[in-house]
Structure formats: structure tokens, C-alpha cells
Amino acid sequence: MRRIKLIVAYDGTHYAGYQVQPNGNTIQAEIESVLARMHRHPVKIIASGRTDARVHALGQVIHFDTTLEMPAERFVKALNAMLPDDILVKQAEEMDDTFHARYGAKRKEYRYHIRQTEDPFRRHYAATVTYKLSLEAMRQAMERLIGTHDFTSFSVTKAEVEDRVRTIYEAEVLEMGDEIIFRFVGSGFLYNQVRIMVGTVIEVGRGKYQPADITQMLEAKDRRVAGITAPPHGLYLWNVNYEKVD
């Protein structure tokens, strides 16, 4: 058996998320369906993490085991020929059998895009926020999220994890053209954590909270004290890094 690593991009607009579900089409189901046709038997894929309905990815990482003898790079063309147009395999590489897309990940980067003007052609790819925002206040708020913290206040109550301590290495607000982008690099993220952090920072930007309130929210460990959950369609899984972090 050989282990193949894929880097995959997808437009999550028309999917019920990454993970296979009994109702609704998913990214995992589409890729596994194509691999099953290629292998003539079911093939299970493992991803670096799950993305929700309408969430996008530029650098999702997946692995699977195969008995096919074709060179790893040929999987790119073979898969893309059969996958729908909103899923693209960008790269394929043969790995050692110790590689694991989920458990081997050291850092993940997420980006969240917002626009301050309505645009019907980009409505699925950036959230629209029409009120005035203070970039300086939002940047100060983002700085307070950097470090190792218990992010209970920034995760959903139903999250099935006992340890909610995560490390954020980088958190910044970028301006790119007519969009504002919230960029996070961390050791890992709780369910809905990025969307809740973004929703809260946006509310800092509009004056509902002060940047210093972020520290109090972290200390409270209570979801009710943080801000809203930003909608899913502005969120992108940007990159997954497997190199050891110093």
C-alpha cells in the first residue's frame, strides 16, 4: 500500500460541508466516489479537518492509501477529470506511511473575507458588513487573541472536546482591494472558533466592544460573553503546515 497526500481547493457554496453526511452532498463524498471508481472498491480519505457548509478551502490536505501503481502526480489529472468543477486537486505527493493529514498537522491558517459594499457576484465568497469599522480597534483586538489561551468563550457550547486550550501564532487584519481580511495562524481551532472570533472583532470595529474586552472574554470562559458568529461563506481554510514548530 502507498500513502498519497493531496492538496485540495474547493468552493463550499453548494455543499453541506466537508464530512460525509446522510443528507446533503459533501466534499468528502465527491472525492471518495471518484477514488472508488478508480480503484473499483471503496477508498477512505482522511482530511486535516472538517469544514462546514458554505465554507471554502484553498489548501485542504487529504491522505488516502492506494494499491494503484500510477505515479503520485498522475492522481492530479485523473481526479480532476472526474471531480465536479468546484473541487480541484492542486497537488499529489507520495508520503511515508507515518504521514497523517489530521494528526500530523502543526499549524493551520484560516482567512475570513468581508466586504463593505454589496456585490451580487461575490456574495458567496465574502460576508457583507455595511457599517463603518475601525481598522485600528480591530487590529488591537486581534493582537489580544495571539498566544496560548482557553478559547471556551470563542467556541460553541456543544463542541465535543474537553481541552479548549489552543495557540494562535499570528492574527492580523489585512486590506486587499475592497475587502478586509482577518488572518489567523494557529496550532488548531475549535468548532466555529474562527467565525466567533471574527464576529466579535467586527463588533469591536463597530464600537460595541473595546479591544481590551477580548482579554476579559478569554478569562470568562463563557460563550455568552463573546460576540456573534460570523456567517460561513466568508471563511477559507487557507493552508495546513506539517513542519515542526520551534
UniProtKB/Swiss-Prot annotation:
Keyword Transmembrane helix recorded: no
EC number: 5.4.99.12
Gene Ontology molecular function, alphabetical: RNA binding; tRNA pseudouridine(38-40) synthase activity
One Pfam assignment: PseudoU_synth_1
Leading EC class: isomerase
Residues the record marks as active site: D52
InterPro entries in the cross-refs: PsdUridine_synth_cat_dom_sf, PsdUridine_synth_TruA, PsdUridine_synth_TruA_a/b_dom, PsdUridine_synth_TruA_C, TruA/RsuA/RluB/E/F_N
Disulfide bonds listed in the record: none
Annotated positions binding substrate: Y110
Assigned keywords, A-Z: Isomerase, tRNA processing
One biological process term in Gene Ontology: tRNA pseudouridine synthesis
Region forming the signal peptide: none
Catalytic activity: uridine(38/39/40) in tRNA = pseudouridine(38/39/40) in tRNA
PANTHER family (UniProt xref): PSEUDOURIDYLATE SYNTHASE, TRNA PSEUDOURIDINE SYNTHASE-LIKE 1
Similarity-based family: Belongs to the tRNA pseudouridine synthase TruA family.
NCBIfam families: hisT_truA
Known partners and oligomeric status: Homodimer.
Xref: HAMAP family: TruA
Cited function: Formation of pseudouridine at positions 38, 39 and 40 in the anticodon stem and loop of transfer RNAs.
Protein name, UniProt field: tRNA pseudouridine synthase A
Source organism (scientific name): Exiguobacterium sp. (strain ATCC BAA-1283 / AT1b)
Recorded name of the encoding gene: truA
